[in-house]
Amino acid sequence: NSPASISPSNIPCLARACPNSFFNSSKYKIHQKAIASARAGNVIGGGDWSKNRIIPDIIRGIERGEDVIVRNPVSVRPWQFVLEPLGGYLLLGARLNDEPVKFADAWNFGPHTDDVMNVRQVVEQAISIYGKGKYVMPPIIGQPHEAGLLNLDIGKSVSELAWQPKLRTAGAIEYTIDWYKLSAPEYYNFTLGQIQKY
């Protein structure tokens, strides 16, 4: 249990506690407030240049001609393309608008549990799609503990919101790497094309 895996899991509890204390659904007609929380998996997509994030680190390594360093190769994460949770958030917002009391709850948006990859698989696929690059796996010594498996239960979002991820993890990686292979002047139109295609 790492801080990264514990703190996000507390958000649904907090999202339930505050409304129950201050905006209880039984008194919705009085206060007219409905609060929901939404949690996403590990989001990937073009335009993320943050440090210590898997895809930007892969791209920087490839573009600099350096080996990509894979620190936790067997760690499994719920990777998903950025438009997946955004679609879920918009759907949740619409449902909250239509039936605020019913949908004021905690929701998860991520891939199906049978569609997860470990870090090494993501790196290998990204390098393959990019068409060049290499990776190395240094010995794991003195690194902070990180959970080996993180996943989200999206069952409620699937059954009650009728939300489904549209892309498999492999497709999310492909959409993402295709974006990074472009030059800056192409980003805008390509992004619009990805949104329309999605």
Regions found by a protein language model. Name each.
Residues 18, 49-50, 79, 107, ...:
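Tryptophan-centric aromatic hotspots in well-structured domains and transmembrane helices
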Residues 82, 105-106, 142-164, 175, ...:
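Conserved C-terminal active-site "lid" loop/helix of NAD(P)H-dependent oxidoreductases
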Residues 169-198:
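Amphipathic terminal alpha-helices
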Residues 74-77, 142-146, 193-194:
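Glycine-rich loop motifs involved in handling phospho/adenylate chemistry
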Residues 12-97, 115-116, 122-129:
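NAD(P)-dependent short-chain dehydrogenase/reductase
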Residues 88, 95-144, 154, 170, ...:
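Mid/C-terminal beta-alpha module of Rossmann-like enzyme folds, strongest
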Residues 25-29, 68, 99, 133-136, ...:
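Short, polar/charged, Gly/Pro-enriched helix-capping and turn/loop motifs at alpha-helix termini
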Residues 1-9:
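Conserved Rossmann-fold NAD(P)-dependent oxidoreductase catalytic core, especially the SDR/UDP-sugar
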